[in-house]
């Protein structure tokens, strides 16, 4: 099964919620009323839902489903130039492989989102692109944190920089950057503890890790990626805001899209934070994490 089919299968719950009740061939107001309920239920959020309805109503289009598709694709595109091209009817090139801007990617997120597994999948993805990848097991507050990443490292033949439980994660991140440079690796993914976004001191710890990376290399980290569980819906948006305030996100990875009817939460995340979705995950397999393509996502969301 190709990734589009897996994405489509993964979005089945969200798609059912969006499509089931909408009488696309009915009169405009009837369609918009059902569409509003469906978008809100899929966690698109009130503000984004109102914007979608307003634009669809103003478009005067007969094919309402196509009008909704175009609007959703535009909202999932934080790059204004590409979004404008789409509005003008041009179809920008499909996204190329996701190339991190620098060599260090700091990976953050709350407990239980599958952060460590996602890092392993990222390692596999970049290995397949011919990159030399290294991991830093910075989740030193959790007994199994380093062990889990270490096991993945063995399976993927990726070196893992780690210390005993309770090691200062900032010091470990510093050492990992030095090791990456000394050994000539292309990419370093720094795992972090599954911090609860409501715990201020844990956010401070994250800032400290980011500063330590910058001390080891003033150019880094150019990328800070948040791993978010789609099942959390609107709460995921609140998490993203807190992390963005603390460490300045450059991308979001959304996991477990196959386990929720709240896949619409991607829209307010991009719209509110102006941060792109880098990857989406729709399964447990090592290849079930793929670069995010707004068009393929909306197609999978709205196609019967």
UniProtKB/Swiss-Prot annotation:
Molecular function per GO: ATP hydrolysis activity; GTP binding; GTPase activity; signal recognition particle binding
Effect after changing residue 86 to Q: No effect proteolysis
PROSITE patterns for the chain: SRP54
GO biological process, one term: SRP-dependent cotranslational protein targeting to membrane
CDD domains: FtsY (cd17874)
Pfam families in the cross-refs: SRP54 (PF00448), SRP54_N (PF02881)
One term under GO cellular component: plasma membrane
Superkingdom: Bacteria
Gene from which the chain derives: ftsY
Family statement: Belongs to the GTP-binding SRP family. FtsY subfamily.
Job description of the protein: Involved in targeting and insertion of nascent membrane proteins into the cytoplasmic membrane. Acts as a receptor for the complex formed by the signal recognition particle (SRP) and the ribosome-nascent chain (RNC).
Subcellular localization, as worded in the UniProt entry: Cell membrane; Cytoplasm
UniProt enzyme class: hydrolase
The species this protein was found in: Thermus aquaticus
Record text on subunit structure and interactions: Part of the signal recognition particle protein translocation system, which is composed of SRP and FtsY.
Protein name, UniProt field: Signal recognition particle receptor FtsY
InterPro entries: AAA+_ATPase (IPR003593), P-loop_NTPase (IPR027417), Signal_recog_particl_SRP54_hlx (IPR013822), SR_rcpt_FtsY (IPR004390), SRP/SRP_N (IPR036225), SRP54_GTPase_dom (IPR000897), SRP54_N_sf (IPR042101)
Reaction catalyzed: GTP + H2O = GDP + phosphate + H(+)
Keyword annotations of the record: Cell membrane, Cytoplasm, GTP-binding, Hydrolase, Membrane, Nucleotide-binding, Receptor
Record's bilayer topology term: Peripheral membrane protein
EC number: 3.6.5.4
Chief site of localization: membrane
Residues engaged in binding GTP: 109-116, 191-195, 255-258
PTM characteristics: Sensitive to endogenous proteolytic cleavage between residues 18 and 19 and between residues 86 and 87.
């Amino acid at each position: 099964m190709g990734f589009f089919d897996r994405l489509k299968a993964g979005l089945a719950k969200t798609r059912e919620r969006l499509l089931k009740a909408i009488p696309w061939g009915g009169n405009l107001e009837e369609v918009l009323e059902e569409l509003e309920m469906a978008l809100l239920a899929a966690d698109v959020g009130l503000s984004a839902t109102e914007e979608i309805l307003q634009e669809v109503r103003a478009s005067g289009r007969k094919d309402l489903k196509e009008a909704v598709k175009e609007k959703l694709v535009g909202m999932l595109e934080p790059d204004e130039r590409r979004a404008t091209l789409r509005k003008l009817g041009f179809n920008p090139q499909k996204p190329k492989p996701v190339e991190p801007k620098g060599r260090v990617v700091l990976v953050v997120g709350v407990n239980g989102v599958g952060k460590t597994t996602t890092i392993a999948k990222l390692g596999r993805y970049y290995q397949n692109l011919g990159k030399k990848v290294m991991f830093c097991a910075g989740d030193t507050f959790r007994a199994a944190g380093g062990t889990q990443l270490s096991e993945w490292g063995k399976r993927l033949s990726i070196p893992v920089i780690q210390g005993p439980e309770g090691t200062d994660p900032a010091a470990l991140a510093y050492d990992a950057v030095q090791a990456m440079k000394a050994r000539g690796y292309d990419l370093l993914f720094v795992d972090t503890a599954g911090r609860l976004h409501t715990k201020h001191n844990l956010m401070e710890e994250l800032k400290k890790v980011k500063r330590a990376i910058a001390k080891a290399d003033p150019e880094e980290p150019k990328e800070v990626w948040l791993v978010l569980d789609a099942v959390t819906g609107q709460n995921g948006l609140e998490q993203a805001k807190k992390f963005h305030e603390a460490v300045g996100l450059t991308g979001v990875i959304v996991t477990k899209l196959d386990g929720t009817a709240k896949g619409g939460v991607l829209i307010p995340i991009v719209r509110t934070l102006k941060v792109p979705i880098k990857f989406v995950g729709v399964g447990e397999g090592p290849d079930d994490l793929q670069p995010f393509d707004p068009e393929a996502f909306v197609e999978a969301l709205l196609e019967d």
